[in-house]
A protein has these predicted regions:
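Residues within the DNA-recognition helix of helix-turn-helix
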Residues: 66-69, 129
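Exposed, interaction-prone assembly regions rather than primary DNA-binding/catalytic cores
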Residues: 124-142
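Hydrophobic alpha-helical segments typical of transmembrane helices
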Residues: 5, 37, 110-111
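N-terminal helix-turn-helix DNA-binding core of bacterial DNA-binding proteins
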Residues: 21-62, 72-73, 89
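Charged, amphipathic alpha-helical coiled-coil/dimerization segments
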Residues: 69-125
């Protein structure tokens, strides 16, 4: 039986998630949630927990738990918002930036090795399609 393209896409995405999870130790010492939170804070911080949760499409309790774990590891610092003392802001620490850079280099190396036989055109096409797919998923989830 021939599967339609959407069935194949769904399967390939599920397989990709499984493969990246199975090989996550080679992708660095941060789990996916830690990595995404540190990336967001590095790019856009400092942020309040509700803003961070919204950007990463997490509920507040999940985001709070993950932020707490990163705070324990000293990868982020939480402090009162100077404009509203009832709100805490979070920013990435130097230790957080150091581990993020280390993990980004490891991840880059893995993807460079995996995609070494792809042409620049194929890489650009993959980049465009993944960016579009993520954007459409975010739109759909709102």
């Amino acid at each position: 039986m021939k599967l339609d393209p959407l069935q194949l896409i769904e399967y390939e995405i599920a397989l990709l998630v499984r493969l990246t999870t199975a090989h996550s130790p080679r992708l660095g010492s941060l789990d996916r949630s830690e990595y995404l939170i540190l990336c967001e804070l590095d790019e856009n911080g400092p942020l309040a927990i509700n803003v961070l949760a919204e950007k990463l499409m997490l509920n507040i309790s999940t985001a709070s738990r993950q932020v707490g774990a990163l705070e324990t590891k000293k990868y982020i610092h939480r402090y009162p918002d100077p404009n509203n003392g009832r709100i805490s802001l979070m920013e990435i620490t130097q230790e957080g930036q150091d581990i993020l850079i280390k993990v980004q280099k490891a991840r880059y190396g893995v993807y460079k090795e995996i995609l070494q036989e792809w042409s620049e055109e194929e890489l650009k096409q993959l980049e465009n399609n993944l960016t579009r797919l993520n954007r459409d998923f975010k739109k759909w989830g709102n």
